[in-house]
Amino acid sequence: MKKMEMILNAIKEGVLIVDREEKIEFINDAYAEFIGHSLEEVRGKLLTDIRPGAKLPEAMKKGEVQEQIHRVEKGKEYFVNMYPIYENGEVTGGISTVTFLENARFLAEKIGELNEREAYLDARMKEVNG
């Protein structure tokens, strides 16, 4: 799992994985920073003990994927995606991903800048080519 942990820690989205008893198996660095606890502090603990308002247990009980749930907590806006993990047709855990809006806004700004640059270059090419 070390390589997988390295991969998950490299992304800016928060990742949480729980087992069938809703005990935390893994959180990546982004999720750890968000909740203010390290993986070592939360591993093996009930998700609802660490995050009383967590919705992942509900998604697991219903066996439903829930995507793009907008939340605001501690002054941070984010979107949550929740996925039950199935083995042989049975829910055996869950994964939650958190996309922080500041990351999404940053990407949107970069896309806007690139679109402006492309429009400028298109205009210059038309001038040069007559």
Name each model feature, range by range.
Residues 4, 50, 116-118:
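Short, contiguous hydrophobic alpha-helices characteristic of membrane insertion segments
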Residues 35, 39-40, 46-79:
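Terminal output helix/cap of sensory domains in signal transduction proteins
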Residues 95-98:
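Sensory-domain boundary capping and coupling elements
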Residues 81-83:
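A short, aliphatic-rich beta-strand micro-motif
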Residues 85-87:
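Sensor-regulatory modules in signal-transduction proteins
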